[in-house]
A protein has these predicted regions:
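Short, acidic/small-residue loops that bind anionic groups at enzyme active sites
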Residues: 79-100, 184-203
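Non-catalytic positions within long, well-ordered alpha-helices that form the structural scaffold/packing
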Residues: 58-61, 122, 162-163
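Glycine-rich, highly charged phosphate/nucleotide-binding loops
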Residues: 39-56, 149-157
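Beta-alpha junction/loop-to-helix N-cap segments that form part of ligand/metal-binding clefts
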Residues: 50-77, 81, 174-178
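C-terminal and late-domain segments of enzyme folds
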Residues: 4, 173-179, 191-220, 224
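N-terminal glycine-rich anion-binding loop in soluble enzyme alpha/beta folds
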Residues: 1-48, 109-147
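Hydrophobic alpha-helical
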Residues: 67, 71-74, 155-187, 200
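Short, glycine-/small-residue-rich phosphate/pyrophosphate-handling segment
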Residues: 98-136, 152, 205-233
Length: 233
């Protein structure tokens, strides 16, 4: 099984460690994409690039694709274009959290990420169990500048979600933050979901079960069907 992760460079080994022995995870950077996604504008930029990427990846023989952003930019559109699973970390993280507790909280990078994250939960149908979304207050590109300080801040925000919002589970709402999940879980004593790991495991489950998204939900755009039909004549 081959899964392509489209996101920031330098994550190949860590992502591969999350996968099973029969799975190969290939990490690639989307050419022309933003260095980080911290606004709706940047989500739209990433979404447009994802469309071309997924078609090429399916032709290349990949079994599943994971866009490397918690906001799941472009996932719905990409599913219309291909038949292989396209799994967003946001969806995978929220779904996993709902299996582990009655209410879950999300730690987002910045204040500006809170509303889009809440909207994402509504879009995926996981808003009923969402206890709250709180910002870490650290930009994505600065999260690794002081790992100890970032972990301390993560623990503080997570505890506020647990104590004030009654969250039973914490989801790390950023791909860069996701690699701190095990440390944070040890520090705060509740399950902490790494959305990238959850996405890889969900891809493995779907592919090994010969399942993918329904084309009744995500049909090929009619204009593209018409073009393909003309080309086949």
């Amino acid at each position: 099984m081959r899964i392509c992760y489209l996101g920031p460079p330098g994550r190949q080994a860590r992502l591969q460690a999350f996968a099973g022995p029969e799975t190969e995870v290939i990490a690639r950077k989307m050419v022309g994409g933003p260095e980080s996604v911290e606004s709706v504008y940047e989500e739209f930029l990433s979404a447009a690039l994802l469309m071309d990427e997924v078609v090429a990846l399916e032709r290349e023989g990949f079994d599943a694709v994971i866009p490397g952003c918690f906001g799941d930019p472009g996932v719905d559109g990409a599913r219309e274009l291909v038949r292989i699973p396209v799994i967003g970390p946001g969806l995978a993280g929220m779904m996993t959290a709902c299996l582990l507790g009655h209410r879950y909280g999300i730690v987002a990078p910045l204040e500006g990420d809170v509303r889009p994250t809440e909207t994402l939960a509504i879009h995926h149908g996981y808003d009923q169990k969402l206890a709250g979304v709180r910002p870490l207050g650290v930009a994505v590109l600065e999260m690794n500048s002081d790992p100890a300080e970032t972990l301390e801040q993560l623990a503080g925000v997570s505890r506020s979600l647990i104590e004030q919002c009654r969250a039973d589970v914490i989801v790390l709402g950023c791909g860069t933050l996701s690699f701190r999940a095990e440390e944070l879980q040890a520090a705060i004593g509740v399950p902490v979901v790494n959305p990238l790991r959850a996405a890889i495991k969900l891809c493995e489950t779907l592919v090994s079960s010969s399942l993918s998204h329904s084309k009744r939900s995500y049909p090929m755009p009619p204009k593209l069907v018409a073009v393909a039909s003309r080309g086949a004549r």
